[in-house]
């Protein structure tokens, strides 16, 4: 039952992401996303930032955000999340989708739970820095979609991460 609920939540989250990019953005909305992208690139040089259509993706890939079996964010990277919060607060009509990930150590169920905790840890930092809780959606992906080789310790460290996707909130503009 727990696995079914997790799968249902992941499906809903993916639907949110896919629906968000399917609507036509206004020129102002597109400019806001472009400004968000440029601000992330400028203020967070340690991050990999990309713009894909109507979404901005941010990954602190080189950062060791989490120790093994931990959802506690490495204190060295809290300032990066604080900077991110300040940028997000300039664009209050955007949503933030946070995906948590693990390396391959641990069972699938354990990794799913741990990755959810990691996503929620990142969410808590954003909320503590005045990003509205209602704008943030967090979920765990477990060991899916590794960005580095899980056969090495260095690769496993990189896979213990969170990824952020910023997209425009269309609900705010419906009249």
Task: Place the predicted regions along the sequence by residue.
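Soluble non-cytosolic domains of exported or imported proteins
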Residues: 31, 71-79, 105-117
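Core alpha-helical elements of the protein kinase catalytic domain
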Residues: 17, 86, 123-124
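Periplasmic OmpA-like peptidoglycan-binding domain that tethers envelope proteins to the cell wall
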Residues: 101-175
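Periplasmic peptidoglycan-binding/anchoring modules of Gram-negative envelope and division proteins
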Residues: 36-50, 65-99, 127-128, 164, ...
């Amino acid at each position: 039952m727990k696995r079914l609920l997790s799968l249902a939540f992941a499906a809903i989250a993916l639907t949110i992401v896919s629906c968000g990019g399917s609507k036509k953005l206004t020129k102002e909305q597109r400019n806001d996303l472009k400004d968000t992208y440029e601000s992330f690139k400028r203020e967070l040089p340690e991050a990999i930032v990309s713009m894909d259509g109507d979404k901005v993706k941010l990954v602190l890939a080189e950062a060791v955000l989490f120790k093994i079996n931990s959802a506690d964010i490495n204190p060295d990277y809290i300032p990066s999340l604080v900077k991110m919060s300040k940028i997000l607060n300039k664009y209050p009509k955007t949503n933030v989708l946070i995906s948590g990930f693990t390396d391959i150590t641990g069972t699938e169920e354990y990794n799913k739970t741990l990755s959810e905790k990691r996503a929620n840890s990142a969410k808590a930092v954003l909320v503590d820095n005045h990003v509205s809780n209602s704008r943030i959606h967090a979920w765990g992906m477990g060991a899916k979609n590794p960005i580095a080789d899980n056969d090495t310790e260095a690769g496993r460290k990189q896979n213990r991460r969170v990824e952020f996707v910023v997209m425009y909130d269309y609900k705010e503009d419906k009249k």
